[in-house]
Amino acid sequence: MRSVPLVAPRRLELVEAPLPEGPRAGELLLRMRAVGLCGSDLHWWAEGRIHSTPARYPQILGHEPVGEVLAVGEGVTGFHVGEVVSVEPSLTCGHCEFCIAGRHNLCIHARFQGGPEAPGFLRDYAVIPAHNADRVPAGLSVQEATLIEPLAVWVHVYELEPVRLGDTVAVLGAGPIGLLGIAMAKQAGAEMVLACDRVPHRLDLARRMGADGTALMGERDFRELVMDLTRGRGVDIVYDAAGAPETISQGLRCLRPGGALVLIGIPEPLEFAVDLHAALARELRIQTVRRSNHKGAQAAALLAAGRIPTSLITHRMPLEQAQEGFEMLHSYADGVGKLVFDFDLKG
C-alpha cells in the first residue's frame, strides 16, 4: 500500500508499505478515502516536534481521516462493510481514572495516531478500534467529513467554555480551526464575532464563515477594533486558535472583566511570557483545551444539518502530492484554507 511518512523535518516520502494486520476482535479495517491536513501536522513537519516532544522518524502524519469499512472484526456491532466512517485518532486505555470519569482526552496512557506513538492516516489502509469510529451521515462527501475530527474539538471546547446567546466573541487566528470556531460561535447565538489573522485571504474566509468584523495583524490593532465595536467593554470570550505569544497576550487585553480566554492553538516556543496581572486584575478565566473527547457523532450531526459551512475546504490533492500540500499550507499559498488529501484522486 502507499504510505507517506515524515522522514526528516520538512521532508515526506511516498513509499510502499505492508498492509496492516487484522482486523482482530473489536477492530475495523479501513480503506482511507480522505484525510484533512491540520496545523499540528504542520508543526511536526516544519519543526520536527510539538512542544518538547520530538518526532520519531519515520512518522506517519494525518489525524483527520475518513475511511471505508473493508472488514469487521469479531464482536463488532453497529458497523458494516462498505460504510464510511470518521475516526477519533486518540487511542485510550479505558481503565485509568480519567477514562473511567469520561475524560478520555486526558488518558494517561493515550497514544495519538499521527504522533510519534502510533501511525497516522496518510496511508491507504488502517486498522482501528471500532469504538473510535463514527459513521458519516448520508449527504456528506468524504472531503466534507474530514471536518468531523477538528469540529469535534470545538464540541469539546463548548463543554468547557461555551458561547451563550448574545455573547461577543473574538477568534484569534483564522486557519481551519479558527474558521470552524467562527461558525460555531455564530450557530451558538453570538451577537458579534470578530477575527484577526496575518494572512489577508484568511480574513476573506473568516467573513464567509460568519465573522462580523476582521483585522489584519500588523495593519490594524485588533484590540482597537474590539473596543470600538463593543463600546469600550471588551468581548465575553476570546478563542485563541493561533497559539502565538502575541495573540495570547492580545487576547487577555481584549476581554471584558470576568471574561474567558480559551487556548486552543499550539504555541511554537516552549516558554514565553504572559502578563497574568492583566488576568488577575479583572478576574479573567483561562481555559486550555486538549484534543476532543469522543465528540465525533455530535460534530457529524452539525455538519449533516448544514449548520457549519464547509466552504473553508479550498483545495484537494492526491496522496502522491503530500509534500507539495504541506509546502502550500505552510506558505499560505494559492488562497488555501483547508486542504484535504483525496485518496480517490490520481497523482
Predicted regions and their residues:
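Cysteine-cluster motifs in flexible loop/terminal segments that predominantly coordinate metals
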Residues: 38, 89-134, 138
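Glycine-rich beta-strand-centered segment in the early N-terminal region that forms part
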Residues: 20-35, 50-97, 137-139
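C-terminal hydrophobic helical "lid"/dimerization subdomain
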Residues: 1-3, 249-252, 293, 297-347
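Glycine-rich cofactor phosphate-binding loops and adjacent beta1-alpha1 units
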Residues: 161, 204, 208-285, 344-347
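Mid-domain Rossmann-like dinucleotide-binding core that forms the NAD(H)/NADP(H) cofactor-binding site
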Residues: 131, 140-220, 224-225, 315
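N-terminal glycine-rich cofactor-binding segment
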Residues: 3-22, 39-71, 86, 107-119
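Rossmann-fold dehydrogenase core element
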Residues: 260, 273-312
